[in-house]
Amino acid sequence: MKITNSVCVSNRVPGALAMALLIAGCSALQPAPVENPNLHMLDARPVSQMAPERRDLVVEVGTPRAWPGFDTPQMAYVQRPYALEYFANNRWADSPARMLGPLLARALEQAGGFRTVVQAPTVVPADLRINSELIRLQQNFAARPSRVELTLRIQVVDVRGKRVLATRTFDETEIAPSDDAYGGVTAANLALHRVLMQAVDFCIAESAKLPQSATPTQ
């Protein structure tokens, strides 16, 4: 019996050793974590255009969502179609969708087209809700110079009427000033500025479909 036990143990040793080597090999293939990556911000320039009139409406900016692959602080890039990769030493300070919400609210507020603009979650009753969805934010290295591709979907909702007034997708491309992560950040902010200007115009135009409770003020 002792001989049998020794054989069983000796048979298990090579298997355990092989498993340990396999795990070690897989670990070696994993990229080493970066302790102090370079952090970057989305911070588009202030929107310059002003609304033709101020409507007595409260606008709520909903929490933006992001499509899979872009719901992360990692900075995405592509070198060939359908293959999403991330920079190892550079990342966003927060996920782009989370940074987008305050920027959209600020742009709507600066345009001066509404009585007030609030961000979700809020206890303030709203007339309009602006939902946003980040479909794509990536630096494309398939062409030279590289370029940033930004796609954002905006939905305007009549809160009191419980209906969607309109949905529109905005798509912008901006050539990066340099073929690196920082060049992509610069291009992303320029593209975002244009998208926010278009989104503000869209939201103001759609708000005209709603009655307002007070006389508009100039």
Describe each model-derived feature in a short phrase:
Residues 111, 115, 199-206, 210:
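Solvent-exposed amphipathic alpha-helical surface segments
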Residues 82-91, 160-201:
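Short secondary-structure boundary motifs at beta->alpha junctions and helix caps
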Residues 97, 101-105, 111, 189-196, ...:
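Extracytoplasmic/secreted envelope proteins and their assembly/folding machinery
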Residues 2-17:
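Bacterial N-terminal signal peptides that target proteins for export
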Residues 64, 133-137, 171-173:
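Generic short beta-strand segments
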Residues 27-50, 55, 111-161, 177:
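Surface-exposed short loop/turn segments
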Residues 27-96, 206-218:
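A structural "domain/chain start" motif
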